Design a protein with these regions (language model features):
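Extracellular/luminal Protease-associated
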Residues: 109-205, 274
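Noncatalytic luminal/extracellular "stalk/propeptide" segments of secretory-pathway proteins
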Residues: 44, 48-147, 153-155
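Soluble metallo-hydrolase cores and metallopeptidase-like ectodomains found primarily
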Residues: 23-25, 108, 112-137, 196-275, ...
């Protein structure tokens, strides 16, 4: 049967692959993509005719209308989809600057978007200030008519990011021309987002000057030289409100017109350059991909939809708007392919196994093409609906729509141009653009023609809290059971996020980053949780400076590999150390707190050796309830105190139950000085035993309240599950079982029988007893703090 199924799947796979290879449209897309690829025409228009496309700018509006017009000219249904509005618009003009004296030098600088320009050419001296300087009268005289050099370094954001500061207001009142900050190469420039009133526009220019020029000028001023600078910055505002739109285009599906494959890229950009890489490259690829599909005569089963988004740089506003307005379509979107990673060629697509297995047959023809940049489908981890997101695919992911990772690989270093003055057309790699547009077109066509939508079950992580242990051998992903084991979960999460006070790591620092796997027992556990660098050279036994009770949940057990638990030195001594099981360790149940399990990366767990490193730990929350679970020191300590009170109450209840049992069942028992209660059932001989004498002994018994039964074995009298009671040799003063039992046996005479109740502190105490671990057999365990009942006989 299995052989027949494998043959059937093999022939299905082959037939799908051959169908794609013989598909005339597939071949036509390839031909056009190689011989008539116009992606760089779109790129040129976006960058060199329209330019930087800031949200709220005329350039963005022009780009949206142009893209819609292009789609319509190719025969697509196209529309502008309103995504939002800004109360005030912004258009950037040219900017110039130079040092006039003590020598003439052109200045390399820029300004963030939505900040003030100059009043024509403005010339003034340089004054160096700190942003916290008190503006005395003498300083105010120096500020008037000056360019103010601030001792702050550029981070891209405007000087008054959230609101106009009091310091800025004082500079304006004192007659400053503008502020200047130092900026590293390449100069990164973002935008101001609090320009909400046409009657209250920014007034003071906000200049970012390349660092070496900034430092040279500052040194001259500090030496007492007068430096004169001139700036001409043409930043223009536009009275709003100004609406901005996504651009939507459709190739209708022939069989499933209400099901979709979405091709997405954001059309907006920052405007200090021309938005070539971020994200003109992505928009141009998507435009060309849809053009190739139309020109090849594609009639896909499902509708292929191109979406060019507005205001991605302002928080994925365009894509979020569309996703929110089209909730009825969520279940009908097979996939969303997004390009916002730069100009390097697309060489792969990463998807979870459940999708990989389904899609592989129709992707193989793309893999088999002789491309300059070979393409490969890759199996990746489960999709996560979490985080703020850095690109528009996140809007779809959060709605449960597959938006796989397109892997780009090549010579361009994205961060060298990202949001900087270098994001220009000359940075684009033409053949990588052409290749990628072709690959996107083929992916869209193949997926749109599948018999069914891409599977989602098993592709997304369920709602919950997850921890990624990034180790030197790979990533281990843990599901944290915060709902059933909240206190222990809060401890782990709080330490990982640096929000629980401890005696080893400074506040705000992740407790586990840089720690090692200090204990690895093959087939048993791997264990970590001691910081690599601790404060004041603390003894590891005292870390993290507190202990908290066990939190046993019956719904979790040690019955398999990959269970996550807290290591302890006895009941209620949990701290920071945790372990992951390497096999069935059911005998640990009840004595160690489990609070999660491995969901991905078990291969990494199995490869960990002692001394391997946890580079970092990151916490992911998915869903409203998970996002509400935000432990801190106060909330954690409150849980600990409540747990301690419960432990105390449970112990008192247990003690009373034991006392009641003894009162009813052994009313005439004798109590020793150590608290052992016993009753002589049968008197032995008058013969007194002596130290070093060997006795033949046997016993049976149980845990007093829990009723776990056990008997003596021939192995030095150790307890076990065995049904038959075994005699054993007990050498007085030498044989050690537990203190209470040893004491009772040593006092007994040959032939004597006793019923004995040994309190936990005289039995196995806080450590409990663990029998020999035999593979394939349940391990015998007496839990810590167990009071034991014995029936003992001295045979001879």
């Amino acid at each position: 049967m299995k052989k027949s199924l494998k043959l059937f799947l093999f022939f299905v796979f082959i037939s799908l692959a051959l169908k794609a290879q013989s598909d005339s449209v597939f071949n036509k897309i390839v031909e056009l993509g190689r011989t008539n690829n116009r992606v760089m025409v779109h790129q040129d228009y976006l960058c060199n005719i329209i330019g930087g496309r800031q949200t709220g700018s005329d350039a963005y509006t022009n780009a949206a209308y142009w893209a819609k017009s292009e789609l319509e000219s190719w025969g697509l249904e196209a529309q502008l989809d309103e995504a939002g509005e800004v109360p005030v618009g912004f258009n950037r003009g040219p900017w110039f600057g130079k040092m006039i004296s003590p020598n003439q030098t052109l200045l390399e600088f820029g300004t963030p978007g939505y900040t003030a320009g100059t009043k024509g050419k403005q010339k003034g001296h340089v004054a160096v200030l700190n942003s916290d300087d008190t503006l005395s009268d003498s300083i105010k005289n120096k500020i008037k008519g000056a360019w103010i050099f601030l001792q702050k370094e550029n981070d891209g954001w405007p000087r008054d990011r959230d609101s106009v500061s009091e310091f800025t207001k004082k500079l304006i009142d004192a007659g400053a021309l503008g502020t200047v900050m130092s900026a590293k190469h390449p100069i990164q420039l973002l935008d101001l987002r609090n320009v909400n009133d046409w009657n209250d526009l920014p007034k003071l220019p906000d200049i970012r000057l390349i660092d070496h020029q900034f430092n040279e000028i500052k040194e001259l001023v500090l030496k007492g030289e007068e430096v004169i600078l001139e700036f001409d910055i043409r930043n223009f505002f536009k009275q709003g409100p100004i609406k901005y739109h996504n651009v939507i285009g459709l190739i209708p599906g022939t069989e499933f017109p209400d099901e979709y494959v979405v091709l997405g890229a954001h059309l907006d950009s920052y405007d200090a350059a021309t938005g070539a890489i971020d994200n003109g490259s992505g928009a141009a690829r998507m435009l060309e991909a849809i053009r190739l599909l139309v020109k090849s005569g594609a009639k896909p089963k499902r509708t292929i939809m191109i979406q060019l988004y507005a205001a991605e740089e302002r928080g994925l506003i365009g894509s979020r708007s569309w996703v929110k307005k089209n909730q009825d379509k969520h279940d009908k979107i097979s996939v969303m392919l997004n390009n916002d990673g730069g100009t390097n060629p697309i060489v792969g697509m990463g998807i979870p196994k459940v999708i990989y297995d389904y899609i592989k047959p129709v992707i193989e023809p793309i893999e088999n093409l002789e491309l300059k940049y070979p393409f490969k489908l890759q199996e990746t981890g489960i999709i996560r609906r979490a985080g703020r997101g850095g690109t528009d695919s996140h809007s779809f992911t959060m709605a449960g729509i597959p938006a796989p990772w397109l892997r780009l690989e090549g010579p361009h270093v994205y961060r060298t141009t990202w949001h900087t003055v270098l994001d220009t057309y000359d940075q684009v790699i033409p053949d990588a653009q052409e290749h990628s547009a072709l690959v996107i077109a083929l992916l869209a066509y193949q997926i749109a023609n599948l018999d069914k939508l891409l599977p989602r079950e098993g592709a997304f992580l369920p709602e919950g809290i997850y921890a990624d242990l990034n180790t030197n051998r790979g990533t281990i992903t843990l599901n944290i059971d915060y709902q059933n084991v909240p206190m222990t979960s809060a401890n782990f999460i709080g330490l990982a996020e640096g929000v629980i006070k401890n005696n080893a790591v400074k506040p705000g620092k992740s407790f586990y980053n840089g720690s090692i796997w200090h204990r690895v027992v093959p087939g048993h556990v791997i264990q970590a949780g001691i910081p690599n660098i601790v404060l004041d050279s603390l003894n590891e036994d005292n870390i993290p400076g507190y202990e908290f009770p066990n939190e046993i949940n019956s719904g979790l057990n040690h019955g398999k590999a990959g269970m996550l638990g807290m290591a302890n030195a006895g009941p209620h001594t949990n701290g920071s150390q945790f372990y992951i099981t390497l096999g069935d360790r059911s005998y640990l149940d009840g004595n160690y707190t489990l609070f999660g399990s491995v969901i991905e990366g078990m291969d990494v767990v199995n490869n960990i050796v002692q001394g391997d490193t946890i580079k970092s730990v990151s916490i992911t929350r998915i869903g409203d309830e998970a996002n509400k679970f935000r432990p801190d020191t106060e909330s954690f300590l409150k849980m600990v105190e409540e747990a301690k009170q419960k432990v105390k109450a449970d112990d008192e209840k247990k003690l009373k139950a034991e006392e009641e049992w003894i009162r009813i069942n052994l009313p005439d028992a004798t109590e020793s000085e150590s608290g052992i209660k016993y009753k002589i059932v049968s008197q032995g001989t008058e013969y007194k035993t002596e130290k070093a004498q060997t006795l033949k002994v046997r016993y049976s018994g149980n845990v007093l309240i829990d009723k776990l039964s056990f008997v003596s074995t021939s192995n030095e009298g150790k307890p076990d599950f065995a049904a038959e009671v075994h005699e054993f040799d007990f050498v007085i003063g030498t044989t050690k079982i537990n203190n209470g039992l040893d004491k009772m046996i040593s006092e007994m005479k040959p032939g004597e029988k006793r019923i004995v109740v040994v309190p936990s502190h005289m039995a196995y105490g806080t450590t409990g007893y663990y029998g020999k671990n035999i593979p394939g057999q349940k391990r015998f365990v007496i839990s810590p703090n167990s009071t034991l009942y014995y029936e003992i006989e001295i045979v001879e």
